[in-house]
Each structure stands twice: as C-alpha cells, then as structure tokens.
Amino acid sequence: MEILYTEITQDLTEGLLEIALEELEKNRKVYYIVPSSMSFEKEKEILERLAKGSDTAVFYLLVTRFKQLPYYFDKREKATMKTELGTVGLSMLFRRILRSFKKDEIPLYFSLQDSAGFLEMLIQLRAELLTANLSVENLPDNPKNQELKKILTTFEAELSVEYANYSEFGDFTNRLADGEFDQQLKDVTIIIDGYTRFSAEEELFIESIQEKVARFVVGTYSDENSLTAGSETIYVGTSQMITRFRNKYPVELRKIASSSVNEVYSKLTRMLDLDSRFVITDEKIELKAEDEKYFRIWEAENQKVEIERVAKEIRQKISQGAFFKDFTVLVGDPAAYEITLKEIFDLYEIPFFYAQEESMSQHPLVIFFESLFAIKKNNYRTDDVVNLLKSKVYTDVNLDEEVIDYFEYYVQKYKISGRKKFTEEFIESEFSQIELVNEMREKLLGSESPLQVFLGNNRQKTGKKWVSDLQALLENGNVMANMNAYFSAAELQNEHQMADKHEQVWQMLISTLNEFFAVFSDEKLKSVEFLDILLAGLKNAKYRQIPANVDVVNVKDYELVEPKTNNYIYAIGLSQTNFPRIKKNSTLLSDEERLEINQTTDENQFIEQLNVANYQKNQFTVLSLINSAKESLVLSMPQIMTNEQGEFSPVFQLFLKDADEKILQKIQGVNLFESLEHIGNSRSVIAMIGQIERELVESEETNEDKRVFWSSIFRILVKSNADFQKILLDLAKDIDTVNLAPDTLEQIYGDKIYASVSSFERFYNCEYQYFLENTLSLETFENIDINSKIVGNFFHEVFEKVMKETDLSAENFDEKLTLFLQEVDKNYSRYFTQDATARFTWSNLEEIVRQTATVLKATVSTDELKTLLTESSFGLSKSELGNFSVDDIYLRGRIDRLDQLSTDYLGVIDYKSSAHSFKLQEAYDGLSLQFMTYLDVIKQAFPNQKIWGALYLQFKNQPINLSEINQLSEIANILKESMRYDGLVLEDAAEQIKGIENIALKNTNSYNEEEFEQLLKLNEEHYRAAGQRLKNGKIAINPIMKRSEGIDQSGNVRGCRYCPLKSICRFEANIHMNEHSREIGQKSQAEILAELKGEGRDE
C-alpha cells in the first residue's frame, strides 16, 4: 500500500494522475476511485486533464466508486426469480413486519408502524449496520434496542428467504478474501482520491484487496505536523486514518509537492490551522488589499441582490473570454436559494446545472395519486376532486379543458362535497353548462366510472387484487393514454428533459407496484392503506439529474465542495446558522450508544460517532472550500435570509480580523457609485433600469457622470431592443382601458340601461369593478358567513313574514317570530349544511334574529310608526311601487320596509348585516345612492304624501364585556342602546321621530325640504353622469381614494379594500394611485350643503 499525501493548498489529483499514466504505460488497468458525491464531475475533470483540456475517453482507466467495483469483476448472471427490493420496497417490508407485531411485543414502536419517518429511520439504521460490518446483536442492550432487535431480526429473516436482497459489495469483499479474483487482479492498479476517512465496510474491502493488486495507492490531504500532533490539527481525520493503516499494513508513505501554490489560500489555511489548534502565536497573518484579486467576502443586502451580483460578474467574465463551465456556485441552503437563483440566472441568460435533487411530488401523476388517496380518506372533499381532475391524468381523452373549469365553478359555487353528491346528478338547472358538467361527472365520477369501480367500497382486498384493480383504473381512466400523450408531446416539442421526467415517473410507478406486489401480494388491505403505501414511495422519489450541456455553471450545496474545484468559486448564503452546518443526531442510535458499540466490537467493525464525524467533516469542508478556487474565491452572506437577520459566521470573523477593508465588500442592489458592475446583459439591465432611475431621482448628490453613463446605456437599449421600446411606450399606459366600440355598446346596453341601485354604488367605487361585475356578469364564489347574501336573504325573509302579519302585536310577537324562524330555517337548511363555516354561521343566526327582533317588537308596540309594506319592489315585473327611471336608466330594487308615521308621513327602513349610517359626503361622492333613490321612489309612487326620511337597522347580536359592567341588570339597557335605527330625517318630522323609541337621530342628518329636494336632484345627477359614461363606452380603472387615508396596511386604497378583482385590473396603489384613482372626501358637510343651497355642484 502506498499513501500519498499533500497539503490541501496543493494539487493532489495531479500527482495521482502521474501515477495513473505510469500504470497505463505498463498496460495495467487503472480503477480510479472517488467519492460518490463527486464521481461525475471528477470523471470529467480526470479525462480532460489526461487529454490536456479536450473531451476524451481512456479505455483502460475507469473513474468509479467503491460500490461499482463488483460489476467490473463479477460477470455471473443472477439466476433467481426473486424480487430485489429498493428503498421503497424495503420501507414496505418494514411496514408489513411492524403490522405483524402485537402491542405488548413492541410497546415503544407499535404506534409508529405507518409512520414514514420511522420507516425511513429503520432503513437508515439497517444501512448503517451493513456499512459498519455490524449486526443487530451488536446493539447495546436496553428496552428500545430490544424492540429494534426484534424488528430487524424478523425483517432480515423475511428478506433473506423471500427476496433477492444482499450486499453485493460485502459478498465481493468476502470472495476477494477467498482468492476468487486473484488472477484478474494481477494487472490492476487501484488509486483512491478524495477520501479523508473510510467506513468499516470500505476498510475491510481495502484489507482484502490491497495485497492482491499490482499497485494500491491512497491519495489524501495532510502535513507532517498532523501526522505527529494527534487531534490538534486541521487534518485530524486523515491523520487518524493514516495511523490506523500504518499499524495494519506495510505502508509506503510519501509526500507530494507542487511548485504552484496560491499564497492567499495558504494564508487562509494557516489561519484555520492555528485556530483549530488554539495556538497563541506572535505570527500575524494579514490579508492585504492586493489579495482582493483572489479572495473577497461579501455582505449583501439580501439573497436576490447577492445572486444578481454573482450573475453580473459571471456575464462580465464571459465577455472577457471565460467559459460558463469555469464557474461553480456553492449555496449554504440549496432549497432556499433554488427558485430565486433559477429565475435570476434565466434573466441573465446563464446556463446552469442545479445539483439539488428535485422531488417528483409535483408531477401530475403523483398529484393524481395524492388526490385519489385524499378523496377516499376525506370522503370526496371538493378541492380533492377538483385537484384530481385538474391533474389532467384521469380524464376522457376527448374532454375539453373548459369543461373542467365549468365543473370546478359548479362544485365550488354550490358547495358539492361527499361521495353521494358527486355520484348523483347535479340539479342546479339555472347553471348554463349543467349538461356538459353532468356528462363529465357521470363519465369520471358516476357510479359506473373507473374511479368508482376502484374506490367504490371499503372491503379489504389482497395486494395482488389491488394491483390488478389499479391497472384497470389506469387503462379505463385513460391514465396510461394521457401519460403517453404527455411524453410524445414533450418529445415533439424537443423538451427532452420534460419527456425524461414523464418517463422516470412512470417507471417509478411500475417499480413501486412491482415491489408492492412482492411484499403485500397476499396481505389484505383497505383502499386507503393501499394508496397510502403506494403514495409513500412516489412522494419521496427524486428525479435522476444529468447536465444537459457541458458548458454550464455548476450550482450545488457547499458541503459537496472539494479542493481545486474550479477557476471561479462563489459560495453564497453562508451565515452563522449554516457555515459550518450543525447537524443533530436524529437516528435511532444515540452518540452514547455508538461509542459503546465501538468499544466492544472487533477490528473492521465500527459505526460512525456522528458528533465526532460531523465536527471533522465540517472542519474539512471549510478547509476544502477556501481551497476550492484556482483563480478567485468569494464567500458571501446576505444580511436578510429567510426573513431573519444574518450574522457573520465565526469563519468570516476569523478571516476579517486582520484583513484590509477591501476584502469585505458591501453588495447593494443599485449603487450609484458603481456603474459597469451593474452591467450583466441587456435583459437584466432593462429589468433594473427603473430602480436605477429612482435612485438617480432620489439621490441628494448631483452626480452628473453617473447620470450621463446611465442615460447612454438607456439610449443604447432603446435603439437596439425593439421589445424594450414597446415596454417604454406601454409603461405609462400599463392599466389604461380602451373605450368600448359602438357596436359592442349596442349589444350590451342597447337604448336603455337596466341595473340595480347597488350596482351604481359599485360604479362610483370603481368604474372597472362595475364593468366586470355588472356588464360582464363576473361572479366570485361566495362563502356562507355572516356577511353573505344568503344570510341577508335569510334575515329579510324572517322579518318580512313577521311584519306582514295583520294581527301582529307585542303580545304575540315572540310566538310569530318563532313560527316563521322555524319555517325559514327549514327552507334555507340546504345552504347552511354545505360546509363547516356555513354550519357555524347557521348556529348563530337565531340569536341575531332574536336580538334584532327586540327593536321590531318595540316598533310594533308603538302607534307612532306603522309598517305599510314589506319587501316592496320597484323596476321589476309586478312591482308594488312601479317603475323608476332617470332618463334612459331603469333602476330596480327592493325596499325592506315602508313605514308611516301617525301624521301620515312616509319613510323607508333598510335592513343591513353590517354597520351603516347615512353620510352626506358619501352621498355627494356617489357612494351612497340607496337611501335617496328609495325616497325618490316612494315620492313618485305616493305623490300626495310627505316624506319623513330613511333609517338603517343592523342585524347583530351585540357582544358585551362583562368586566365592564357593575350589575347584570345593566345588560338589558346596554343591548337596548346598541340596537337602534340610524339614518336621515326631514326637519318637519324630526320632533315626532325623536319621540319614538330606538331611533338615534343626529342633528347633522336632519334636512329641510329644500335640502332634501337638492339631494334628490344630486342623486339623479349621479345616475345621469354614470349612464352617460357607460353609453360613451368609457370605463376607467379608478378606485376611490381618500387623501387622508392614503394606502392601508394591506397596500390598498379604499376602493380596492374588499375588491376580489385586483388580479384582473392589476391596479397597484403605490404605482397607480395618483394617476388612476378618484379622490373623494374633498369637501366638508358645510361646503356640500352650501353648494346644494346656492350655485349647484361643481363639475
């Protein structure tokens, strides 16, 4: 055995390749073994080095991994019909084994038999024991491990009898020791590169082969000091390994050296070495200003800015002659950086390979199985059924996608949920596409559909029967046909990576079903259990990843770094929390148990002590990282990372302690003191030109040079990029609307406009909202809560029936109320049983009705105010109050109550589910049209009677804070005060109104006859103005805005506050408020009244 070592600042691979070339010249076959995590990149690097930079192949040199070696030597065919279980199959077998135990046999683990996490830990423990050359008998004796021994012993017995699983590597090692391959190994050289420690399984292999090959070479990193200093060294793991091998074998230990060593990286390595040994020394290691060329530390504003700066530097170096493959980006948190990095690199047109395993969980086929499981488990919840159909895997091959949208609309609107409702015919005949939706429902969800045949009953079936039934579902439900169509479409469009993903997912399904068949073939299971087991295998599966191109930027976890990785290294997202990365032991064996095992086992039997191994690994990872670049290394930390303030890692602090100020660089999104640093490519400059412009405008310093520079860039982009020209032309009009054409106006409005009163209040809130909801009849799904229309109709109907009673009195009021409440409650039950929110709302309605009814009861008791009509309509067929129009605008509505004073004055009562009061300012701005319109209607319907006014009554059950009252007797008065009418009255009737109980009369809402007439005229003018704009085809996006309110916490002006249509209009308050909003509340009540009395309204 030869062990070649060198310091990590030097090129180990160069020395090992010299040996490889010597051996190839002797016609020996060279097996070059590298760690699994870097085998692809290492193979590419070695072949390029051997061919002096160009791609090539060397027949007698194989870059491989330990576990692949048996395939090169053992050519025997497997003569077994047994199934070999993969990770998914092993998890299934562990699940089956756990189900076979009784609770008293494994009390600690019995409840975890279906836990995916526990099953994964069992697989991990078994794999660790194999790698450590241990068996369950080596586990320390305690109650927990006794249960694990039972589980693993039963598992291994079942596995060895029924399945073709065994350790090929372990078997190969045993056969090596027996001399079976001695003849083949005579002309073989084995070179090992990149290892600082070996597992027990690998060390046993080394022991078995090292004397049988022509030459056995281990290359690693160390120095003379480490070989004598013991644990106080940065190479502690390597020194322990070398010492162990020297004690076991005759070892030729040699140091290899290189003349080309980067002094900056040597400084950093020396700093780490001294720090790891806690040495106090007079030696001062400084990073100077000129070292910036090779090493920098960034402190970036945030992740986005950090990645953008990497992208800009890559583009600039590419323009100077570098290749994309010369760059490697290492990330501290691969998952957190994945989406942002991909978006930014795409913007900067940087090809990259992100070495982060991508889960199959988002593939339509996996979503189909997730939805199938959820449907059965949750009894056909609406969203689960919709998700199943929207996966577009289970569907009729000729089904129009639009029908799925109709189906989703229907089931959401009518709250369809539960198997019974989906298997029965949909009955809401007013839905325009009911026939299409029912046809699809019958085919895909009806009682004879493939899905119902598969999920239809809860009987247990054997595993083989479930596999057979699923196969029928996949065929009859067109799942196979659709998957084939997806694959073919991707291939036709040259989207080969997507086609490969479709193929991988399908192969994973087949593999999972085969392993399920092998494990659960004769086991009886319910459908939920079958789908749960199947889904566990699919959800955790990952796509195989292969770079689509050689000239790409490699992006990967920083823990996968090795020395001399690439020319330019950017290690980003390194904070105190992840650099170095602290890992907790989450396995089934504690660190103490691992130590106990290692103290009692034989040679070539040991298990990793994770606390020790992680410390050594972290130390070597940091060491590898600072020596990973050949030309330039950047270590970077964002100030804000995952919404938390970032802190410098201790490693950063060590390097900055004696560093020139140029080493630490603050990275900002736009910094006007920089110019060329912000130039990446034209697309990225276009993306940030607005930000640069704002910085120039807001900058207090007058920096003409920078202004001239960016103006020049701006002009170049405008001239050279037609798309940018179009963007600029459209910027000022990004949400401008286009007037409707005359023929369109004729079709939608004709000569007359028919609309409700409330729709015009919507018009004055925002014209575009009116257009979408009233002209285009766009509807949003309504959840049944206390503010929904259904609840409002419920209240109205109860009180209409009560107040219509001719013999109603204070004495029989409660009895009549109860009777009608029960009747209406029964009629509305189908709405209030649709979901949990509706049921909760229903449970509160009676209390609200009874609380509000106390006011009505008081009204019934008085002779001063009598109800003439309830729910009287206008503008509808057979309306009690006739038609009402303003010019060519025909209005419709319904007045809740028409009440008459004893003096014959008429007025209006309007019921509301939320708090309302009459505000003159809102009437002036067109936001409150109802009251004045209702009063205008009754004035027209009853021309000979005077008007007293209009009042709101809110339906509510007023909560009371008992801590704020002294005696329980106060509650009745508090409730009475809270339940009051509120609105506007005319001065002539004010005195009489004041005398009626439960009416809150404000002096500011009392108007004389002249003011009242002016308000009516103003109200009619609102309709005329709106009608004129509609007939002219003018529709603006102009939500109302009150200057004193500005933008609220949710980022909205007042007109957008409750609007569900912002995704359509794209109004953004901070951008469009000044140009596209309508300002209200600009005049006080006194100014409005003065205007009404005098010169009329300003236009």
From Swiss-Prot:
GO molecular function, one term: metal ion binding
EC number: 3.1.-.-
Keywords carried by this UniProt record: 4Fe-4S, ATP-binding, DNA damage, DNA repair, DNA-binding, Exonuclease, Helicase, Hydrolase, Iron, Iron-sulfur, Metal-binding, Nuclease, Nucleotide-binding
SUPFAM superfamilies: P-loop containing nucleoside triphosphate hydrolases
Top EC class of this enzyme: hydrolase
S-S pairs: none
GO biological process, alphabetically ordered: double-strand break repair via homologous recombination
Pfam families in the cross-refs: ADDB_N, PDDEXK_1
Annotated residues for binding of [4Fe-4S] cluster: 766, 1056, 1059, 1065
Cofactor: Mg(2+); [4Fe-4S] cluster
Details of cofactor binding: Binds 1 [4Fe-4S] cluster.
Note: Despite having helicase-like domains, this subunit does not have helicase activity.
Described function: The heterodimer acts as both an ATP-dependent DNA helicase and an ATP-dependent, dual-direction single-stranded exonuclease. Recognizes the chi site generating a DNA molecule suitable for the initiation of homologous recombination. This subunit has 5' -> 3' nuclease activity but not helicase activity.
Similarity comment text for this entry: Belongs to the helicase family. AddB/RexB type 2 subfamily.
Assembly and oligomerization: Heterodimer of AddA and RexB.
NCBIfam families with a match to the protein in the record: rexB_recomb
Stated name of the protein: ATP-dependent helicase/deoxyribonuclease subunit B
Gene from which this protein is expressed: rexB
